[in-house]
């Protein structure tokens, strides 16, 4: 267990002589907005280290290691770990490769868990009984430490095997690009002024109600970040929507809508002030009504046609259809095509490696809609 600044510096100096590392994190995120880092696991091919973030104060050597361009950092299903690194250190591992992504290019399902991968490659069944442990509690038990260490001990040799398999299959460039896309997604920070678009059933609201929802959702997200509270512990999403829908004028009306006592006690006056602000807006300051994607004419038909095209293409190229196009990515494409959401960048299905395989066929298909 690495618990001092000097020990961490020595570990990082040794690790920087290697070309690849396996990394993992353990964290807790129950009531907080940001993940609370409890442990970092590192394996450089020679030494497994468990790094205790609760006792270390000087992170510069580790940050330099994270950013060392000569060392590939392997993680498995690392999307949340990327967020943990970004929040704790202001950066993500780079270059970074996700073994779950690698595995999906050589026949494994996209959702392939680490224990499944370990059993497939080594025949070892990992003990997952500590997965729900409190990683902020100290001291950690020997069993907890063994569980945490196993995640990186097995990861690095499996990563090397998968890299070779993906290279032989001709997908290495695509896999690396997919990992870059993961990093890019995790680096995108939601603008509080756009948070209203993420609220379930926002499309059911009229323009003035939407203006109210925009104010409410922006306030809630800022408050959650400021207080480090999960957004639903500020005000539950369904209650936020009800406030926008009914635009109450008193604490009694908030109570009648079903808001909790703590929501009214801590935030009731603020909610009412935001409702009043929305009521005072001029008509030309109100947002346009939101279209509901699934109610668009032809949605079900075009979705089915895209799924069929993806299935056909994935079979031809021997990679999983799940990897090639998720429901989220198909909906992103259709939102872009019908201009239902802000047009910030090209959809994932017609850019990068997916665009090379699907782009022209999708553009032709969408001409009918």
From Swiss-Prot:
The keyword Hydrolase applies. It catalyses: Exonucleolytic cleavage that removes extra residues from the 3'-terminus of tRNA to produce 5'-mononucleotides. Its cofactor is a divalent metal cation. Residues 1-166 form the 3'-5' exonuclease domain. This is Ribonuclease D. It is found in: Cytoplasm. Its main location: cytoplasm. SUPFAM superfamilies: HRDC-like, Ribonuclease H-like. Exonuclease involved in the 3' processing of various precursor tRNAs. Initiates hydrolysis at the 3'-terminus of an RNA molecule and releases 5'-mononucleotides. Residues 206-285 form the HRDC domain. GO terms for biological process: tRNA 3'-end processing. HAMAP family: RNase_D. Its EC number is 3.1.13.5. Keywords: Cytoplasm, Exonuclease, Hydrolase, Nuclease, tRNA processing. Disulfide bonds: none annotated. GO terms for molecular function: 3'-5' exonuclease activity; nucleic acid binding; nucleotide binding; ribonuclease D activity. SMART domains: 35EXOc (SM00474), HRDC (SM00341). GO terms for cellular component: cytoplasm. Belongs to the RNase D family.
């Amino acid at each position: 267990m690495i618990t001092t600044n000097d020990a961490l510096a020595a570990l990082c100096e040794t690790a920087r002589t290697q070309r690849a590392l396996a990394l993992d994190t353990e964290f807790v995120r129950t009531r907080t907005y940001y993940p609370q880092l409890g442990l970092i696991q590192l394996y450089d091919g020679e030494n497994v280290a468990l790094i205790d973030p609760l006792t270390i104060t000087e992170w510069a050597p580790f940050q330099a290691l994270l950013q060392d361009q000569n060392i590939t950092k392997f993680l498995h299903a690392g999307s949340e770990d990327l967020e943990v690194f970004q929040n704790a250190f202001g950066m993500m591992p780079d270059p970074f490769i996700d073994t779950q992504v690698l595995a999906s290019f050589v026949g494994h399902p996209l959702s392939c868990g680490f224990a499944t991968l370990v059993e497939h490659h080594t025949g070892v069944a990992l003990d997952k009984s500590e997965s729900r442990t409190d990683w902020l509690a100290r001291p950690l038990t020997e069993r907890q430490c063994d569980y945490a260490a196993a995640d990186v001990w097995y990861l690095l040799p499996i990563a090397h095997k998968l890299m070779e398999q993906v290279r032989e299959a001709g997908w290495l460039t695509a896999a690396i690009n997919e990992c870059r896309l993961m990093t890019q997604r995790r680096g995108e920070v939601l603008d509080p002024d756009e948070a209203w678009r993420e609220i379930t059933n926002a499309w059911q609201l009229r323009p003035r109600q939407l203006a109210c929802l925009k104010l409410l959702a922006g306030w809630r997200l800022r408050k959650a970040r400021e207080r480090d509270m999960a957004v639903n512990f500020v005000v539950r999403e369904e209650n936020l929507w009800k406030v926008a829908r009914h635009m109450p004028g008193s604490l009694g009306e908030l109570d009648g809508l079903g808001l909790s006592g703590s929501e009214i006690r801590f935030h009731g006056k603020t909610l009412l002030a935001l409702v009043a602000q929305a009521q005072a807006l001029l008509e030309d300051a109100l947002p346009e009504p939101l279209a509901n994607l699934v109610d668009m004419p032809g949605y079900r038909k075009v979705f089915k046609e895209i799924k069929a095209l993806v299935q056909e293409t994935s079979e031809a190229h021997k990679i999983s259809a799940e990897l090639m196009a998720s429901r989220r990515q198909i909906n992103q494409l259709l939102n872009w095509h019908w201009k239902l959401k802000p047009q910030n960048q090209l959809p994932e299905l017609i850019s990068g490696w997916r665009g090379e395989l699907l782009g022209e066929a999708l553009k032709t298909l969408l001409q009918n809609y």
